[in-house]
């Protein structure tokens, strides 16, 4: 009881501090934008060439996985088919692009986002390259567009024509400044649409044609024809603490799962922090650990053979869904309709667990709740290991110590449609 009262008292203070930090971050970003824009005056005058198109996609791996099926629409459309198309991409997903999507564009420019944000020399080198290419048109299809990345790269390219989606950051001043840089703006009819469906609609609006699939689809080159096995993969990290299920909970879940089911539990992650967490979980549970040891493409191959995938709200969710594997998301509710409510989006084979505090708030405000941002670290920690195990068993349709259908020689792979 005392703990509950203390949490209720701490929550408003934590949210107040977070909102103050957000306002300060917005002010810093706006100041940096003006400063960096001034630096761009050193670039030579633009000389755009007819039918040169630049597509700017600088967000992270998960976002790209929800976009990539729509990229080829540009080449196949009557509007852009005769253009020389260049993709300005985030180097973090270069491996997946090269293996699976290289024929969607004519050329690429890769950006190391960390170096871009931290090194003035590297940043100017990218800008100079964009200015030298002479693009007639720039399309920025991201739903949430960073001023310092997408928009400054659009300014560096200096096209005759700019096309984008109306920006939807939480700061109106940011969005107004961003949107003024483009001549054509896509205004989504449904602000609550899942990210995959938003990307589909943007491509249809900008190209006149749309991807025919109803869910993300990733077909790996030289993929093994081996049926999915009995192993589950647990992606144990996330890039913010409020989205990260604690190591203690993962340990509780793995011990409970292994007491009831056969097959390996494999820990995955990428960052140094995730590798350290995975090592701790491995020491406590004996789970297999591949965190930080495999390439993105090899990770995708392993996911394609998994019985199921469990993850916080990370790129791993979108990778697993794209490979049509049963996927359980342990989420805090932030941007839930865009990234974690797959079931509502009509995409099968995915289940999501939210904190009780989030579910209570959503029931009280169903019509006003699509832009939820008030998650704390304690919220996701409140999701119990028993709840996760129960939902996983329902998702994969397995009883304790029952091998999955794939391992018994069935000719189906389970999961969604």
Segments and roles (model prediction):
Residues 1-417:
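Catalytic machinery of carbohydrate-active enzymes
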């Amino acid at each position: 009881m005392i703990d509950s009262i203390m949490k209720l008292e701490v929550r408003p203070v934590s949210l107040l501090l977070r909102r103050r930090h957000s306002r300060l971050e917005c002010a810093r970003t706006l100041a940096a934008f003006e400063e960096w824009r001034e630096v761009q005056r050193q670039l030579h005058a633009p000389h755009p060439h007819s039918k040169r198109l630049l597509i700017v996609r600088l967000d992270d791996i998960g976002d790209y996985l929800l976009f990539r099926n729509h990229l080829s629409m540009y080449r196949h459309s009557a509007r852009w088919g005769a253009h020389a198309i260049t993709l300005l991409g985030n180097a973090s997903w270069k491996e997946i692009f090269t293996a699976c999507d290289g024929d969607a564009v004519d050329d690429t420019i890769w950006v190391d986002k960390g170096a871009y944000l931290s090194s003035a020399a590297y940043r100017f080198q990218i800008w100079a390259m964009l200015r030298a290419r002479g693009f007639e048109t720039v399309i920025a299809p991201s739903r949430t567009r960073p001023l310092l990345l997408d928009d400054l790269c659009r300014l560096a390219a200096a096209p005759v024509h700019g096309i984008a989606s109306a920006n939807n950051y939480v700061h109106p001043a940011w969005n107004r400044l961003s949107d003024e840089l483009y001549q054509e703006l896509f205004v989504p009819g449904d602000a609550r649409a899942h990210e995959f469906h938003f990307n589909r609609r943007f491509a249809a609006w900008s190209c006149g044609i749309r991807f025919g699939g109803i869910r993300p689809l990733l077909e790996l080159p030289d993929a093994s024809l081996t049926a999915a096995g009995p192993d589950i993969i647990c992606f144990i990290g996330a890039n913010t603490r409020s989205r990260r299920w604690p190591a203690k909970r993962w340990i509780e879940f793995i011990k409970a799962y292994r007491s009831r089911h056969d097959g390996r539990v494999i820990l995955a992650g990428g960052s140094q922090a995730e590798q350290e967490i995975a090592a701790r979980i491995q020491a406590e549970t004996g789970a297999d650990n591949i965190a930080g040891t495999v390439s993105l493409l090899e990770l995708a191959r392993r996911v394609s053979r998994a019985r199921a995938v469990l993850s916080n709200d990370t790129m791993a969710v979108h990778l697993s869904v794209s490979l049509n594997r049963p996927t359980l998301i342990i989420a805090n509710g932030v941007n839930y309709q865009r990234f974690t409510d797959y079931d509502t989006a009509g995409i099968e084979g995915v289940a999501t667990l939210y904190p009780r505090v989030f579910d209570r708030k959503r029931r009280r405000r169903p019509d006003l709740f699509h832009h939820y941002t008030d998650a704390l670290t304690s919220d996701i920690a409140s999701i119990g290991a028993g709840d996760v195990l129960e939902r996983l068993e329902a998702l994969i349709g397995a009883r304790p110590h029952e091998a999955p259908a794939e391992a018994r020689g069935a000719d189906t792979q389970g999961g969604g449609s």
